[in-house]
Structures are given as structure tokens and as C-alpha cells.
Amino acid sequence: MDPAAPATRMTSSFTINISTPSFYNPPKKFAPVVPPKPKINPFKAPEEPQSLVPQENSAGPGLHQAFVGKVGEMPPGVDHDDFVLPPPPPSEESISPPSSSFPPPPPSFGDEGLGSPSGGSFPPPPPPEFSEPFPPPIEEFFPSPPPLEECVSDTQDLPVPVPPPPPPPLPSPPAAPPPKPSAPCEAPKPAPVFPKSSPPPAFPKPEPPSVAPKAASSIFIPKPSAPMAVAPKPLAPPPVAAKPSGPVSFAPPSPAPHTFSPDPSAPAHTFSPKTVTFSPKSAPHTFMPKPSAPVTYPQKTTEPPAEASQSSPKVTPAAKHEAPPPTVPSGGRAPGFSFAQQRERPRVLEKPRANLQGSEPEHEPTVEVQVERTRSLGPQTESGRSPGAQSTGGKDMKPLPEGLRSQKPMSDGIHRTGGQHSGHKVTGQQDQTLGSQGLNMKEVEELEMLTQQLMREMDKPPTAEAHSMELCGFCGRGLSRTETVVRAGEHLYHVACFTCSRCDQQLQGQQYYESAGKPLCDECYQDTLECCAVCDKKITERLLKAIGKSYHPSCFTCAVCKCSLQGEPFIVDDNKLPHCVNDYHRRYAPRCCVCGDPIAPEPGRDETVRVVALEKNFHMMCYKCEDCGCPLSIEADDAGCFPLDGHVLCKKCHTVRARAALG
């Protein structure tokens, strides 16, 4: 067998004619129902009792044939006239409630010529012409299942015959622990769990035509590891398959980490809303977990749960022909929903924020929470349904209300259902709160901006010249922003007004000089310059004025020694010629009558000290007695000068010369 194949494919087929028991008056025959992939032989099981194997009446021994086909397709070797349309589905009274165990199969039946059904069991079927390999045990795993769209399209396009109503149920063996209510709506289990009283079947057993084809066409609970294997539990109640009035749900395969697998031996369940599906028909009576189970609502979902939620609303083709079941309100009892579940329903799903819709009934918050969490697992479409719900057709799927279509999950958990419910109410409350507190920041900023604008308008009232920048420096008229202006210094001028103040020459783009705050051209500016008193040239650079004349700094020198007098003291003679101090004293200072040198100021001093006696000039050091040479005092005392006959004498020498003249 090829390991890459999804399941074991049979190369031959059986042509089986099934006859009804003797207590059924009209003989009815049904076509063999081939389950979806994997294609395994449901009529050859090691543990299968012989009473369940149908007998062959028309086909003799050695005519066993099998074929590979689809559900509902007629075998090529069988006459189509032998198959009669199935009767209507069984009523609700003839089926046991979901809480009880699965009813045992009806008694074996055979042809009318073989005896009554109460007689012994039928003889075993003749051996096939070939040896078929036994299917793998339940411990072995098959490859991953094919895409869900392929399986759904195969089962959706072909009609499935509905079996006749089953006989009244017989006393059932000891019932196993009742299944948890959340099992029918949960994702497929990792591995089928059976009660301890019965061994786990290796593969699906062929049920009698009264019940088995219906269970195979209504509910598929495949194993996650096996590719789309039909695994009905004989002792476990089918979710809602036998009741046409109950909601029909189809749980596609999903990866094991995201499935909910209740164990009959475990008292508590682990409920995760990632695999909870919502159908518009059964929304009010959604199954709830027990209070003992931890309820977790993850905010982020992964891709496998999104695929499971998209295809969860899909139904089987057999459910299309049935009338949609009536919607059971939250206060009533739905099929398969016990009163213990209603008492143990947790209140965590009924969020008080969803009650903002005043016109909604009491059970609506639960429906809105379910829809919101279901929509968060899969992508939304324009009509508010998941892609899986759109693929099943519109016969048994009711359109969602307008409030549920626009519902989207929010990060903070607040529902925004519809355009006229809680969103507007919350906005109104916020507006009232802001109004009671006063102005908000936006209104305060607008008020402040208007106030500042009004103050600026009051300070600068609008005038005709408001658009002009400044006034012209010559004519005093306003300068427009559109015309060309000339900036000279700190003033602006019109082009026509910016001319030389003497010759009226245009100065735009030319070199100009400013004299007394007025622009001048180069020639007019040169005319305003002074000439040097020494070289008689225009002084264009630094100007030095002395003795009422203008000089170049290099031309102002001493008249005797020609040294520069810039920054030096000088003395002007009678001819108004500048002289340095030394040359002036040497030339014009008085001379000493003793030494004959000019009497000039001492070095480092500006003052000249001289002694005048007998109309003669003396240096301070040269003022002495002529006879004895002692220094004379400038004061009138005994140490002073006592002149005699034009001589400068001290008192002692004066006495001597006077006595000598007398003697």
C-alpha cells in the first residue's frame, strides 16, 4: 500500500441487495452508502457480529463485486429500478433522548422466504473471490486529511438517501457516563474514547439501514490523525443527528492543540472559545461549560482555529432537505440540553456592557458575546458570515441580524453592535460629563487664539498702507511689496529716488558714498574731500588736523628735523610751522649767560626752569657767585645774590670787593 495515499482504496466492489425483515410488508431496498475518504470496506470487520452482515438473495455465490465511487452514486451492475426513494425521517418519539445511550441495532432481518426475524440469525455471507487486507488497527495513524473544501464538495453535491424509520428502541445495556453537553458543538476529538464496557472499534461498523446511513450523513466526527474517517460511537449519543428538529452541525478536522476532548472519566472540562461555533439557528441555546471548568478567553488566535471557525457552520447535504428547526429561547429547553446545564451555566459570558442595548431581550447578550468571539476567530465577509457558512447554501442558514453583522471585536472588549445602540449612548454620556466639567482643551485653545487675534487687530488697525513695508528715504511714500526697492544702509528707497544728492545720478548697482546721511556718487564724494596742507592732495584715507589745517598722517612732520609728529608733542613757531620740542628749544629757547646753551626743559619734563638776574638768563646749575663759585639761592637772604658792578656775587665776595674799591 502506498504510504502517501490518504487511505486504503479497494480495487473491486460488492453488489449487495438488502431485503427488509418479514414484518415489513413493502419490500424496500437501499443502495450501499459508501462513507467518505478513506475508502475502506465497511462490510469486513474482525469484531463485527454476523447478525449485522446483510444477506444476498438475488446475487448468487461468487458474484461479489465492489466499486470505488461517491456517496449516492448507483453501482454500474445494479438496476436502478430496484432502489426506492426512502421514507420521511423518523419522528422524535421513536428516538431516545441524547442523554441515554445509543440504542442497540434492530434484530437481524432477512428475506421473507427464509423465515421470521425472530428465528435464528442469518448464515454468514459467502467468502469473497479475493483476499482483502485487513484495515490497520486503531492505534495506527493515517496521513493528514485532504483539504476540507474537497470533502465538503463531495458530500454536498450528491444526494444521500434517508433511511426508513427505526423500530422501537430495545432495552439498552448499562449506560455509559452521559457525554458532556459541550461535546456536540466542540471540534473533533484527538482519539475516540469508548466506555470500558465495550472494546474500541478499529473502524466504523455498518449499522442497520434504519439508523446507520442517517448517522453517517448527518454528523462526521473524524479523528485528527486519520483522514476523514467516519467514527460514530455506538454507545455515545449522536449530537443531534437523529432529531430532524434539532440543529445540524458539522465539526471539521482541526489540529490537536486546538481541539476540545472531553474524557468520560474526567469530572471537569477545559473550555476554550477558540473552537466554539455559532449557528444562527441554535444561538439562544448555546451549550455552556460547567462552573468547575476554567474558562479562558485568549485575545489572539492562530490560523488553525480560524479555519475551524470558518467551516463550522457547514451542514451536510441531507440537512438541506429538512425544514429549519424552530429557534428555542434561552428560557426553554433545547434538544440535547439538560436542566442541569441551565443551572450550571456560568455568567461570565453575559457581559454587562452588552446590556446597553435597551431594546434587546434578556438572552441577547449571550448571543452577542458568542458571535463576537466566533467572528474574532475567522475572517469576516461582507454579509457578516464566515466563508464556511456561505458555501453550504442559504436554505438552512438564517441571515444574521443587522446588529450582529456590524459587530467587530474591540481590543478593550467593548461591543459596537449596530449604528444606533451602545456607541451613541456612551457618546452622549461623555458629552454630558464634559459639559458638567466645563470647557475642554480644544475650546480653550480656540478661545485663546481668537482673543490674541482680536488684540492684534486692535493694536494695528487696518489701513490703506498696511501692505507696504516701510517708507522711502527720499520721497517718504510707501514701498509696495511687489515693486523693486533699494536698500542703502538702514533705509529703503525707490529706484528712481536713489540718486546722488548733488548730481542726481542713478546709484542703483554702483558704488556710492554717504555724506551727512545722503548718498553721493564717486566724483561728488571726491569733491567734498579736503586737501593736505603739505602736499596739496585729496585726503581719501585718514585725516589729521593741526593748527587749523588738514594733513595726511605722513605729511605732518617737524619743520627742522622732518620727524613725524603723529602722536608726538610739537611746538609751532611764529611762522605756523610745527617743530618738535628739541628743535624748537634749540632754535627759539633763551640761552644761558654762563654756558651759552639754550635753556630747555629737563628730560622727562615739559617745563623749562631758568633763573633771570641782572637781566641775564641762567640755568639753575649755572647760577653761582663769580668770585668764589658758590651756588646762590634764588631767595632774598644771606645766601642769595649780592650783585656789584654787574657781577653776581655772594655776600662775602661783595664785601671784599666793596672794601677794595674804597681802599
From Swiss-Prot:
SUPFAM superfamilies: Glucocorticoid receptor-like (DNA-binding domain) (SSF57716). The keyword Ubl conjugation does not apply. Residues 342-353, 360-375 have a biased composition (Basic and acidic residues). Residues 35-438 are annotated as: Disordered. The keyword Lipid biosynthesis does not apply. One of its GO terms (cellular component) is focal adhesion. It is found in: Cytoplasm; Cytoplasm, Cytoskeleton; Cell junction, Focal adhesion. Keywords: Cell adhesion, Cell junction, Cytoplasm, Cytoskeleton, LIM domain, Metal-binding, Repeat, Transcription, Transcription regulation, Zinc. GO terms for biological process: cell adhesion; integrin-mediated signaling pathway; regulation of transcription by RNA polymerase II; transforming growth factor beta receptor signaling pathway. GO terms for molecular function: DNA-binding transcription factor binding; metal ion binding; transcription coregulator activity. At the early gastrula stage, expressed at a low level in the animal hemisphere. Expression rises by the end of gastrulation in the anterior part of the embryo, where it gradually increases by the midneurula stage. During neurulation, expression continues most intensively in the anterior part of the neural plate and around it. At later stages, intensely expressed in the brain and at lower levels in the spinal cord, eyes, nasal placodes, within somites, and around the cement gland. Residues 122-148, 160-211 have a biased composition (Pro residues). PROSITE patterns: LIM_DOMAIN_1 (PS00478), LIM_DOMAIN_2 (PS50023). Residues 470-531, 532-589, 590-660 form the LIM zinc-binding domain. InterPro entries: Znf_LIM (IPR001781). Residues 298-314, 377-393, 427-438 have a biased composition (Polar residues). Belongs to the zyxin/ajuba family. Interacts (via LIM2 domain) with hesx1/anf1. Adhesion plaque protein. May be a component of a signal transduction pathway that mediates adhesion-stimulated changes in gene expression. Suppresses the transcription-repressing activity of hesx1/anf1. This is Zyxin. It comes from Xenopus laevis.
